[in-house]
Amino acid sequence: MNYRYDSLDRPVIKYYNNDNPNNAGYHTVYNANGLVGLHKDVVNTQRTRYTYDLAQRLVRVRRNVGGLEDNGAFLAELAYTYENNTNRLSAYTLELLLGSGTSKVKTSFTYGNKNGSQMTDAVYEVRQNGGLHKTYTYDGLGRKTQTMMSMGGANKPIRYTYVGVKDNRTTTMLESLDNFGEKLSYTYDDNGNIETIRKNGVLQETYHYDVLNQLVRADSAAQNKSFVYTYDAGGNILSVKEYAYTTGALGTAVKTTAYGYTDGTWKDLLTSYAGQTITYDGIGNPLSYRDGLSMTWRNGRELASLTKNGVTASYLYDESGLRTKKTVGGVVTNYHVIDGRLYGEYTGSHRLLYMFDEAGTRYSFLYNGSTYYYVFNGQGDVIGITDGYGNMLARYTYDAWGKPLTITDGAGNDVSGNAGHIANVNPFRYRGYYYDAESGLYYLQSRYYDPQTGRFINADGVGGKVGELGSHNIFAYCENNPIHRFDPIGQAWYDAICRGISTVLDMIFPGSKARAEKMMNSPSPYDCVNYIT
C-alpha cells in the first residue's frame, strides 16, 4: 500500500503497489477546516461528498456512481439530524438506489424527558417515517428491562432480567430474555462465562471452559451430542471429539476431527483439517482449503475469488477493505456501505434495506417493500425473523461455533433448499454476522471466519495485546470462546452478552471510527460487572 500526502502531511491518494495512482487509486480532498470533504474511489468509479454544519458535525454523506466528477448518477445519501442543544443524534435519513428504484426511510430517536423522571441520555422511542417501532423501559440503574415492539397495531414485548452478585452489587449480565413467546435463561461460571442456556425452562446447552476461558466442552441437548475441544499451548485447536449427549461422564468418542499445524516457521498456520491439506500464499492467505474450496487474493489480504463445486464467486472492496460487490455464478449483488456500515444491497430484483436502532443494532429490514424484524438471543445471534405483524416466518439454529444447523419456517419445516424463502434471503445469522452461503464463511469486514473449523481463514491485521496470551494467535476466533464473545470486524473480541443492553455506551453516532474508539475505551469491554456496580 502506498500513500501520497499534501503539504500538511495528510494522505490525499492511496494506491496499491502495481497501480497507477492517477487511474486506480483513492483520492481525498479536505475542506477549509481540515475535514474530509470529498472522496474519489477510482476503483469503483464512485464519488462521495461530505457536508458539515457550523459546529463541524457531519450532516450529509452523498455518493454518486459512474463518474468521478459531478456527472455521476445518484447512488446513496445519508443525512444526520441533531438535537439543538446537544450533539446527540436525533434522526438519520437514508436514501438508496436499489436496482432501478430508490428507497428512502427516516429513523428518529426520542430521548428521555427529565421532567418526566426519565434519563435524559437514554433513548425511549425509535420511529421509522414517523411511525412508532420500538419503546424502551429502564430500571433505576439504566438497564433496559423491556423493549415494546409496535407491529401491525399490536404490541410485542421483549423483557430482560439481570444477574445479581454479592455485596449489594448488580450487573448487566443477562439472566433471562423473554422474546416472542420464548424465554431464554442463562447461568454463568465464576469467570462470567455462559455455563447453561435454557429455553422455556428446558436445558438446551451446557458449556465448560479452561483457565484461559477457552471452550473445552459443549453438551448440546438440542443436537443430542456432546463435544470436547483440545488446544495446544498457543491456542490452536488440536481436535474436536464428538460423543453421545450427556452432561455427566463421557463414553467413547464416536467421531474425532483432527487439526494439523506442520509449518515450521508459522506454527499457528492450519495446514490440515480432517485429513484435508490446506495450502497458503506467502502471507498466510489460503489457496486450497477444506472441502475443495480454492481461493485467490489481491492487495494483500483481500479475498478476490473462491471456487467450490465448480461455482466461482468473486468480490470487490472499497478503500477500507469493506465489500462493495460480489458475483456468484454470474449473479451480482451490490452493497451500499456508508460510514463503515452496510445499509442496503440488491441482487437483480431483490432489494434489502437495513434499519438500525440507537445502539447501532440492525433490528429490521425492508425486502421488496415489506418490513421484517430480526429476533435475537442474548448473545446477538439471529434466531428468527418475523413479518410486520410479529408472525414468526423463519428460525435458525447454530452449533457452538456458529455453524448453521437448521433453517426452518415458522412452523419448523426445513426451508434450507428454498433460496427464495425469507430465511435464505436474509444473510445475517450467528452474532449478526453476514453469512456467505456460497462458501459457508462469515464475512467480518476485515476477514472471513470459518465456523466449520472455528478459526479465521487468514491472519489478523492487528497484533496481540500485552498480557493477553490468547490474543497473540492471530487466527483464533475470540480466543476460542465462541459462546460468550463476538468479533464484529475481525480484529478484536467483545462480550456478546452485554451488548445492546446499556443505554449510553453504544449510542449510534456518525463515524464508525468514533464508535470503535468508544467501544475500545469503555471501562472494560469484556466485563459486564464493571459497567454498573
Question: Could you say what each language-model-derived stretch is?
Answer:
Residues D9, G34, Q56, T86-N87, ...:
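Glycine-centered positions in the ABC transporter ATPase nucleotide-binding domain
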Residues A24, A76, V105-K106, H133, ...:
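Low-complexity, glycine/serine/proline-rich disordered segments
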Residues Y3, S90, Y111-N115, R159-K166, ...:
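A motif-centric feature for acidic-aromatic and gly/ser/thr-rich catalytic loops and repeats
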Residues Y3, T28, Y50, Y80, ...:
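A residue-level detector for well-ordered beta-strand positions
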Residues D6, N31, D53, E83-N84, ...:
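Short, acidic, Ser/Thr-enriched surface-loop or helix-capping motifs
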Residues R323, I385, K403-N413, R447-I457, ...:
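Short, low-complexity export/processing leader segments characterized by acidic and small residues
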Residues K465-G470:
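Short linker/helix segments within small regulatory modules
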Residues M1-L8, I13-N20, L38-N44, T48-Y50, ...:
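Beta-turn initiation residues at beta-strand->coil junctions
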